[in-house]
Design a protein with these regions (language model features):
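Inter-Walker segment of RecA-like/P-loop motor cores
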Residues: 5-46
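Walker B catalytic acidic pair
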Residues: 57-58
Length: 191
């Protein structure tokens, strides 16, 4: 089993929970080398693993945008992950993520967690499970209460009139907004 995550921080958190070393996606699947212009060149490694399950956490952060470039850079990070994993002998991929988290940069949706997209784009049989029991938050948590409320409103596409009452939750505090339009800066400084 190989544990992967998009960022160093998410790999470290994953390692802590699983008590097994996790790597960034880039470290596992790409070779890097300096080219003569001082930039880094990336090339896809050969997957030498056999009968290995690759678990990619925080997959909502994995981009699917392709570019007009050539070779490796005309493909998305998800393209490269799938190409790398399935090039190994009998290797499998488990994608883990939260569909309610922010999508990748320059994307409106996290397609890496979208069954239809994955099935159509990569011609793979997709099996998915959605977990609905929270285990890392206190049942009486205000954060959990509002996160659940927001998730439900997103599913129902009810984006209007979202209001929060902070009373009764010890883990929430009201912070007054600051309007920067009323702040003025001095026009000169004394030396």
């Amino acid at each position: 089993m190989i544990l992967l995550a998009p960022t160093g921080r998410s790999a470290k958190v994953l390692s802590g929970y699983c008590e097994k070393e996790a790597f960034t996606i880039h470290k596992e699947i790409f070779y890097t080398k300096n080219n003569y212009s001082g930039n880094l060149d990336f090339s896809l490694k050969v997957n030498k693993h056999k009968d290995t399950l690759f678990i990619v956490d925080e997959a909502s952060m994995i981009g699917t945008n392709r570019s007009e470039g050539v070779g490796l850079f005309s493909q998305s990070l998800l393209d490269n992950v799938i190409k790398y994993v399935y090039s190994g002998f009998k290797c499998k991929l488990l994608i883990v993520g939260d569909s309610a988290q922010l999508p990748p940069i320059k994307s409106n949706l996290s397609y890496s967690l979208n069954d239809e997209y994955l099935s159509k784009e990569y011609d793979k049989n997709i099996y998915s499970v959605e977990l609905d029991q929270v285990v890392r938050q206190d049942v009486n948590s205000g954060i959990l209460s509002y996160a659940t409320s927001i998730r439900e409103k997103i599913e129902l596409k009810e984006f209007h009139d979202i209001k929060f009452k902070l009373n009764g939750f010890s883990d929430l505090i009201r912070v007054e907004a600051v309007s920067y339009t009323h702040l003025t800066l001095p026009t000169s400084y004394a030396v």
